Every structure is written in structure tokens, then in C-alpha cells.
Amino acid sequence: MIETDKLATEQRIIAATPASSHEEVFERALRPRQLDDYVGQEKVRGQLEIFIEAAKRRSEPLDHVLLFGPPGLGKTTLAHIIAREMGVNLRQTSGPVLERAGDLAALLTNLEANDVLFIDEIHRLSPVVEEILYPALEDYQIDIMIGEGPAARSVKLDLQPFTLVGATTRAGMLTNPLRDRFGIVARLEFYDADQLSRIVRRSASLLNAQIDPNGALEIAKRSRGTPRIANRLLRRVRDFAEVKADGQITAAVADAALAMLDVDPVGFDLMDRKLLEAILYKFDGGPVGIDNLAAAIGEERDTIEDVLEPYLIQQGFLQRTPRGRVATLLTYRHFGLSVPDARRPERDEWDTPDGK
């Protein structure tokens, strides 16, 4: 039972991580190529415009950049845009791939002047690789060992000036020495429905899909604030529209397609509803401990904490308390339930005694 649910969770259509290598290829085709085409993240985009222009005027590499935030918000896209705006090459890798110091040294020594090195999941770098990275970031030099045993000696190699762009969904897992070496740190936030609607319309035009503004907005509202999910839903709605609606994506067509996919009006799927319904119906709205909740829905604790809960908490449908998980007023309303009187004081704990 648990294995089946794990498989279902990994294949969720509203998952923020790429579903397959095929989807990654599809994403690359839809990526904006310039900052002017990048939708949303206005603060980050404005900062990068200034920093990139200043670096180009001085003919210097851009300061090292750390991009962090939930998956699917455009960190990889921004890394590609940074390289393109700087007019340099981009080399891409990920933290888990760099297992040995030699792996990183090979990448660094092949960089040309002012190139961008993009390391995804940078929080997963091994300590050995991190140690090599520190002098490379500060002094554009690396120390490598030549030979073995008593004959081994350290050789210092000079590197071309370069920019490291690191991306992570877990900035708290970065070591302080590594974090301190980034001159530019930017957090990517969830998108609102209007921004996602613009992304959906742009992607639809690239896919030659016919979509009206209301159809784009309907997809956007169910995309959980994440462009990757919006583009995935657009592909599935396009399939539905071509078979059932002469290819035209309207609000009604999008609603019918997403209902078929079990994605409700706020972007919840079966797994989200299963978790919330368990709290409401099996545990009277909570509080319930994470282990009891995991047993009740046949999921692993890590899956609940890392995959299911973050969006529910961010949207205000779930609370973590010292006593366990608790359903909020929004959850009761979403399922059309009246709120038990015993629950009201917990939800209104900041109100004054007279209710004002």
C-alpha cells in the first residue's frame, strides 16, 4: 500500500519537480532567453539587470550568485539568462554529480574568462568538493595534489575569472563559509495568478495552442504559484482541448480538463485532499501527530513533510503546532464543513476578548 502511494506521489501532475527528462527538454524550449522576457520576480530581475550591466561596463565577471526558493520557480532559467545577458558560456552541473575534488577541478580549469558555472542543488556538495571551491571563488585559484604517498605535492593552478551561480531549495543546509562567498543572494517567491496567466499565454503561443485569457487564468489559479506546474497543466489541457473542444482552450474547457485530472480550483490533487480529509474526518480536525497521520494515509513521514505539507501550510490550509497538525478555517470552508465551536478560539488566538 505504501509503495503504491509513493509511486503515485512521485507522479503527481502538480509536483514542482520535473517529472522526467522529456519534461526537462520541453521546459528548455519554453524558457525565456532574456531578462525582458522573464515574467515575475520583479525585485530579483531588477537587481540582476543593474548588477549585470555594471559588470559588463567594467568588463568584469558578475559576482557569484545564489538563487534559492521552492522548486519550479525559475532558478535554472535565471542561470541561463545571466550567462546569455553577460554574453558568456554556461557550464551546468549539480551538487550530487560532483563526487570528487577532481570532478570540480576539471570543470573549473576548462572555464573561459567570465564564464558562468551553474551548480544546481549546491547544498548537496560534499565537504571535500567544497574545500576546493573556496579558493576558486575568492582568488580564482585551486590547489590540487599530484602524486601519492611521500612524493605527493600540492600544486596551485590559476583559473580564469568566472561567476558561480548556485541554486538550492534548501538554503539552510548550506554551510556558512559557502554562503558567505556569494556576493548576490536572491530568493525566488511563488507567483500570483496574473503572473502565471502571462506565462501560460506565452507558452501557449510557443506551442501554437489557442487559448483565451480566461482559459489561461483558470490554469494559472490551479498551478500552485509555480511556472513548471502551469506549463505541465497547459500541455494536458491542450491535449483535452484538441480532442474535446476543437483545440480552443476556454475557462470551461480548462475547468473540465483539470477536473478530469483531479486538480481542484485551488490546485489540490487527490494526495492533498487525502491528507486534509484524514485530519478532518479521522482526527476531528487535529491536532494529530505526524506519525499517526502518516499511518492513516499510508504515506511515509518524509513524504508528508517534504512533499505534501509545504504548499498546504503556505496557503493557510494546515498548521504545525507543538501538539501536531491542525486543520484551519480555510480547510473547513474548502470542504464545505461548518467549523466546530471548539475550534474557533484556536483560530482566533490574536483577537481581543471582546472580539474587536
Curated annotation (Swiss-Prot):
Q: What intrachain disulfides are recorded?
A: none
Protein name, per record: Holliday junction branch migration complex subunit RuvB
What NCBIfam families would the database entry show? PRK00080.1, ruvB
| Stated role | The RuvA-RuvB-RuvC complex processes Holliday junction (HJ) DNA during genetic recombination and DNA repair, while the RuvA-RuvB complex plays an important role in the rescue of blocked DNA replication forks via replication fork reversal (RFR). RuvA specifically binds to HJ cruciform DNA, conferring on it an open structure. The RuvB hexamer acts as an ATP-dependent pump, pulling dsDNA into and through the RuvAB complex. RuvB forms 2 homohexamers on either side of HJ DNA bound by 1 or 2 RuvA tetramers; 4 subunits per hexamer contact DNA at a time.
| Region (Head domain (RuvB-H)) location | 265-356
Q: List the GO biological process terms.
A: DNA recombination; DNA repair
Q: What is known of its domains?
A: Has 3 domains, the large (RuvB-L) and small ATPase (RuvB-S) domains and the C-terminal head (RuvB-H) domain. The head domain binds DNA, while the ATPase domains jointly bind ATP, ADP or are empty depending on the state of the subunit in the translocation cycle. During a single DNA translocation step the structure of each domain remains the same, but their relative positions change.
Q: Where are the transmembrane segments?
A: none
Organism listed in the record: Burkholderia cenocepacia (strain ATCC BAA-245 / DSM 16553 / LMG 16656 / NCTC 13227 / J2315 / CF5610)
Family membership: Belongs to the RuvB family.
Enzyme Commission number(s) from the entry:
3.6.4.-
Task: Give one GO term, molecular function aspect.
Answer: four-way junction DNA binding
